[in-house]
């Protein structure tokens, strides 16, 4: 596993790109999506500014490797969460279903799709935010 300071640095580089997207930030965000811990930490930052976060997540998705369905599914599910957070349930529904098509065995996309289907998008955003903020706090407490 990477040393904690390297994880923190990847997160900080990615988070800095949410409002000022750059190649470096997109690259760091892609690295964040390779580990659940960093993905969740970055989710907290994306949800801090959901509108900019949604645009940034779409940048990252376009840059993501098409040959890595697990990562693509996670990114697509993230877009669904951010779409809910910005009051776009239509986009959220499309993204949630696409995520489960891309990665049918991935837990996060599956949860996002289930909660979207039963009309619990807002509740899901709260749950994701709570978990993500806890993960971010722990990452920086070490």
Predicted regions and their residues:
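Charged, compositionally biased boundary regions
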Residues: 1-142
């Amino acid at each position: 596993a990477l040393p904690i300071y390297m994880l923190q640095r990847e997160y900080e580089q990615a988070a800095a790109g949410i409002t000022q997207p750059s190649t470096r930030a997109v690259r760091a965000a892609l690295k964040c999506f390779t580990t659940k811990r960093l993905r969740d930490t970055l989710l907290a930052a994306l949800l801090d500014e959901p509108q900019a976060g949604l645009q940034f997540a779409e940048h990252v998705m376009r840059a993501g490797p098409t040959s890595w369905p697990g990562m693509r599914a996670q990114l697509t599910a993230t877009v669904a969460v951010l779409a809910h957070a910005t009051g776009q349930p239509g986009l959220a529904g499309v993204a949630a279903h696409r995520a489960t098509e891309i990665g049918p065995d991935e837990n996060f996309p599956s949860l996002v799709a289930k909660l979207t289907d039963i009309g619990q998008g807002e509740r899901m955003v709260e749950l994701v935010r709570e978990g993500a903020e806890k993960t971010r706090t722990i990452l920086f407490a070490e």
